[in-house]
């Protein structure tokens, strides 16, 4: 008998969390190289994107009509209070007390409410993603099933991961950090480089020389290459057998990425900036603009992730989820999606973020021997102790 995916929502509430005593997303990576900081934000020299000085995130709690509770989290580290406002003041009123056939019907309903006004991305879709994750978590708990088993009939029981970022101040410290992870069974790592390809190649060569046991390297330039430097980077990183070259050009540059994919060198990976199927579909059609698709579950939710993955698969493009900044709820949701993702790529893993909730989060996900096993727990595999969230709650 197929699982019951219908739902009726009793209540929805979102909470803004901040971890002010923790290290930033960048930790000590390239510290002292001209970074600019404000009270909440940080700009790293060489990149355009703003980052949070300390981890902030919006959690969403959904209670179904039968009392089952689920938790969700959006990947919205900059301005999580915006997601909270959208959830608490707008979306909650639209769905509380309503019945839906399944989470897809809920997602479509909420998307339709504002699509005619152009709200097809950004914080509005982040809020939808957080609610979607929470709803699937609640349904999984009600049905006594991991979410992955609700998404696909035979999820992977185990998968291996790569470390996202080697965030230490000096090259030698970065080498030592990678080698310490290799000793745990890790097979791959992704490094963040600027659009300066000469400097990037020097960094990569130094790491490869200092950590020769690592099997796979990935490179992410965070959208900072020109067309010329991206073409050179694709070639040079390809010569070094980089598994993929991530986010080379500006995220709106469809034509540029299409041209780049056709050039020789490392495969091109991207997708974290897309919220919905409607944004990504053109990018995987011929001439395609990417070789590896990387949706971010904190922006797509489970429901649209599965649709996006299928669209990419029909175009012959494998999917491996992106994992950005967030805590155990977002990470657990991402790992559930990894269990049903394309097996040919290692799964991204943020090694230092999953424990930020400390005792407030009881997770069944445990890194061991270079990867994770799908926990024998219902929902996303995480239980939240609300009473212990109090020290992290930001009240505006």
List each language-model region with its residue ranges.
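Metal- or metallocofactor-binding catalytic centers and their adjacent structured scaffolds
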Residues: 47, 63-142
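Metal-dependent enolase-superfamily TIM-barrel catalytic cores that perform enediolate-based chemistry
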Residues: 149-264
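Shared catalytic-loop signature of beta/alpha-barrel
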Residues: 241, 252-371
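Hydrophobic faces of well-ordered beta-strands that scaffold small-molecule active sites
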Residues: 70-72, 161-164, 189-191, 215-221, ...
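Conserved, mostly hydrophobic/aromatic
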Residues: 67, 91, 131, 144, ...
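Flexible C-terminal active-site loop/helix
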Residues: 2-24, 33-42, 308-311, 325-396
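Glycine-rich, aromatic-flanked loop segments that form ligand/cofactor-binding clefts
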Residues: 123-128, 132-168
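Non-catalytic terminal accessory/regulatory regions of metabolic enzymes
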Residues: 1-69, 88, 188
